A protein has these predicted regions:
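Phosphate-binding loop of NTP-binding sites
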Residues: 5-149, 153-165
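Short, intrinsically disordered, charge-balanced linker/junction segments flanking boundaries
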Residues: 63, 183-189
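Short polar/acidic secondary-structure junctions
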Residues: 99, 172, 183-185
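Glycine-/charge-enriched secondary-structure boundary and capping motifs
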Residues: 173-176, 188
Length: 189
């Protein structure tokens, strides 16, 4: 049984499962186990997780990679929010609520932005920052952290990272490792 943060430990079904010897896993433990043996790609951030995770899953699918993915919304063009693929990649929306993302340990982690959220879990902005720092440090050895250089809070986080963690910046600023320019919308996209 996978127990989400919304289900109390004293929930009758959880208690019955434990009494019957049925394993009960926290959502973070279960999702982390799904990434085992895969190239885990976790997307975290206060805003943009679903969009960014969807774009990565869609691109990998369009390239014929057949990734596994779990996203917080239905992906346009794939018509699903989850897929068990045969490819090497597993793309997951790395939700910070209740520190779910701490159980993931991806090969590639993305942080889109950070703005203090979920005060029930993170009473202070410093607590929120510390949680994202722990997520960033959970990247597997040899992995990479992709950070949005347009967000001051994310840039502040990068300063707290160990030098051994490879981080690559992206954004709209020319100082980023990768940046977009001359952006044109076609048909509203």
């Amino acid at each position: 049984i996978v127990q989400s943060s919304a289900v109390a430990p004293e929930n009758p079904e959880i208690l019955a499962a434990r009494a019957a010897g049925i394993p009960v896993y926290k959502r973070s433990e279960f999702l982390g186990s799904l990434l085992a043996g895969k190239i885990g790609i976790g997307v975290a951030g206060t805003h943009g997780k679903t969009t960014t995770t969807s774009m990565i899953a869609w691109m990998l699918t369009a390239l014929g990679r057949d990734p596994s993915y779990i996203v917080g919304g239905v992906i346009k063009g794939l018509e699903s929010n989850a897929h068990a693929g045969s490819g090497d990649e597993f793309v997951i929306e790395a939700d910070e609520y209740d520190r779910m993302f701490h159980g993931l340990h991806p090969q590639i982690a993305v942080i889109t932005n950070m703005e203090h959220d979920h005060p029930d879990c993170y009473p202070t902005p410093q607590d929120y920052h510390a949680a994202f720092l722990q997520y960033a440090q959970s990247v597997k050895v040899g992995g990479v952290l992709l950070v949005c250089a347009d967000d001051p809070a994310v840039l502040s986080l990068v300063k707290d990272l160990p030098a051994s963690l490879t981080n690559v910046s992206y954004g709209l600023q020319s100082g980023s490792n990768y940046y977009a320019e001359n952006i044109h919308l076609v048909d509203g996209y």
